[in-house]
Amino acid sequence: MISLFISNFSNLSNLSPTFDNMNMNIPSKKIVPVPTPSEKVVSLVSRTGRDLQRYNTAGYRQVVGCVPYRYKKHGGGEIEVLLISAQKKGKGMLLPKGGWEIDESIEEAALRETIEEAGVTGQLEESLGKWQYKSKRHTMIHDGHMFPLLVSQQFEIWPESEFRQRKWVSLSEAIELCQNSWMREALEAFINRKCQTQ
């Protein structure tokens, strides 16, 4: 419809001699391609609220996260893990995780949460498993699904960069610093898998 209007408008000079007499410059019709995204664009704003949260049949909130890792440069294949600070100061270091929502796959949720909280992305690997844990207030049980993520890109600015710190640490430091017992178990599962493949 718009292109038809532009086409008709640009042909008005042929229909009315007064346009020539007025010495007007009428732009010629241009076809401007509309960019089509080939991949999803990641928002720089974290999702908030629980309206889209996924729960299992027992009422357990479904949470998903990652063990972001990389191979240390000049480290002979040594692995480093990325930990993030808790939102509240003094609550220690954690792995990135958050709610799995009903409009996304478990893999999409894992990548989204890791970008939002840690500002990294990369190659998601096979799930490490599922751990049950109690919420902060100990009133609700959550299922925590964790995936290894081989980091290929680290962003300088990310959705939660204003109130989270991040730190690359050795595997032993990660076990020592990680505050949540279920996350330490996920780290141990990750270490066991990597030991078997090396």
From Swiss-Prot:
PROSITE patterns hit by this protein: NUDIX, NUDIX_BOX
Motif (Nudix box): 98-119
Transit peptide extent on chain: 1-37
Cellular component aspect of the GO annotation: chloroplast
Keyword terms: Chloroplast, Hydrolase, Magnesium, Manganese, Metal-binding, Plastid, Transit peptide
Main location: plastid
Tissues expressing this chain: Expressed in roots, leaves, stems and inflorescences.
Pfam families: NUDIX
Phenotype when the gene is knocked out: No visible phenotype under normal growth conditions.
Protein name: Nudix hydrolase 21, chloroplastic
Originating species: Arabidopsis thaliana (Mouse-ear cress)
